[in-house]
């Protein structure tokens, strides 16, 4: 039995609230159970120096945790003077995941930055950030299309992510912190709505895991992400015009 009493193939309660930042071109507050991540999308009419004069845009992401997002207070990375390796890894993952479903040439020479701030962490912050970031990005691009800034939609699909793991020898979907801290193996899956794999991170924590267990984890991820795609579209559809 899982601590949350969920069945192995059941997500936590997932909500996506849009329009939570009045200034950003797109915003989304996503919750996976007690994990809460605020994502804002900012459109800038320029690109990084290495992208100039290439006729294409860029999508990037930053990720951070509020000091009391976890059980004990952590110092702000700005106060420490540098980002941790974990932070850099996660924000690169978010950026890669979003660019997998964006035609950068259709975006034109502009950049969209997704800022992902973890308000509360209870496992799965990176997967929540990816899933919520797509919603914020979609809303921002819709705004550019409505304003006539873009003539062609640069977003070519959906992307979402979820964690899976082996908990007490049972493959389960969407681990919370209690499960993740005790799991024999854990993984993160990033998939598109046409079934393409963007990234899979899988690690044996307390033991190795079998090919059969991996395939069960993959099947759970496909099921969970399929449900997330529906929730993403519902959130975008319900978003009020800026």
From Swiss-Prot:
Keywords: Nucleotidyltransferase, RNA-binding, rRNA processing, Transferase, tRNA processing, tRNA-binding
PROSITE patterns: RIBONUCLEASE_PH
GO biological process terms, semicolon-separated: rRNA catabolic process; rRNA processing; tRNA processing
Pfam families: RNase_PH, RNase_PH_C
UniProt EC number: 2.7.7.56
CDD domains: RNase_PH_bact
InterPro entries xref list: ExoRNase_PH_dom1, ExoRNase_PH_dom2, ExoRNase_PH_dom2_sf, PNPase/RNase_PH_dom_sf, Ribosomal_Su5_D2-typ_SF, RNase_PH, RNase_PH_bac-type, RNase_PH_CS
One Gene Ontology molecular-function label: 3'-5'-RNA exonuclease activity
Catalytic activity: tRNA(n+1) + phosphate = tRNA(n) + a ribonucleoside 5'-diphosphate
Binding site for phosphate: 86, 124-126
Its biological purpose: Phosphorolytic 3'-5' exoribonuclease that plays an important role in tRNA 3'-end maturation. Removes nucleotide residues following the 3'-CCA terminus of tRNAs; can also add nucleotides to the ends of RNA molecules by using nucleoside diphosphates as substrates, but this may not be physiologically important. Probably plays a role in initiation of 16S rRNA degradation (leading to ribosome degradation) during starvation.
NCBIfam families associated with the record: RNasePH
Family affiliation: Belongs to the RNase PH family.
Subunit structure: Homohexameric ring arranged as a trimer of dimers.
Name of the protein: Ribonuclease PH
Record organism: Caulobacter sp. (strain K31)
Gene giving rise to this polypeptide: rph
